[in-house]
Swiss-Prot record:
It catalyses: Endonucleolytic cleavage to 5'-phosphomonoester. The gene is rnhB. Its main location: cytoplasm. Its EC number is 3.1.26.4. Residues 15-205 form the RNase H type-2 domain. It holds the Pfam family RNase_HII. This is Ribonuclease HII. The lineage of its organism: Bacteria, Pseudomonadati, Chlorobiota, Chlorobiia, Chlorobiales.
Length: 205
């Protein structure tokens, strides 16, 4: 079970500690989505939060349940979404940084400290931060952000599946599965595909 033990030393002197994570760096289609989550100072998770973990390790049903609990319990939360066209224009790393910063800037108030999943971050606002490799499986606030980012992105891709039914976005959410690669080979790419993400299997360079 993830606890808020990582946040507690920060809460001794700060009240606005924010967890940040993203979803959708690797897919061939769709946006990259980041979430920023601030829990109340000295928050102690109970109940369904005992099941919180890196969103990739959770079932879709549990992610949805946790997302609801996170939104209800958080002091504030926000999302940042960067579309495929922008990803192609500025590259996926820059797009991920942009999504994270958009999420932070969309919070109701400016956090005092950021806990960021991964090993790099480029803040727009002058806020102190710490990057944590595999933070979504170590830090409560980051895991919560990973769930919000993943569930929102999945919802966006499911909506896109209705517009582009031939690709099966509601199943693989844009990731490079065999079914998705086959659909691209048969139909070409659609408007939400990342043109800069090339497939060697299809001879793309």
């Amino acid at each position: 079970m993830l606890s808020t033990d990582f946040e507690y030393p920060l809460w001794e002197s700060l009240s606005q500690v924010c967890g940040i994570d993203e979803a959708g760096r690797g897919p061939l289609a769709g946006p990259v989505v980041a979430a920023a989550v601030v829990f109340p100072r000295h928050f102690r998770p109970t109940g369904i939060f005992a099941k919180l973990d890196d969103s990739k390790k959770l079932t879709a049903e549990l992610r949805d349940e946790l997302a609801l609990a996170i939104r209800e319990s958080a002091e504030s939360w926000a999302l940042g979404v960067v579309d495929a066209e922008t990803i192609d224009r500025i590259n996926i790393l820059q797009a991920t940084m942009l999504a994270m910063n958009l999420a932070v800037e969309s919070l109701g108030s400016t956090p005092e400290f950021l806990l960021v999943d991964g090993n790099r971050f480029r803040p727009v606002l002058p806020i102190p931060y710490q990057t944590i490799v595999k933070g979504d499986s170590k830090v409560f606030s980051i895991a919560a952000a990973s769930v919000l980012a993943k569930t929102h992105r999945d919802e966006l891709m499911t909506t896109s599946a209705a517009e582009y039914p031939e690709y099966g976005f509601e199943v693989h959410f844009g990731y490079p599965t065999a079914r998705h690669v086959e659909a691209i080979a048969r139909h070409g790419r659609c408007a939400i595909h990342r043109q800069s993400f090339k497939l060697r299997k299809l001879g793309e360079k």
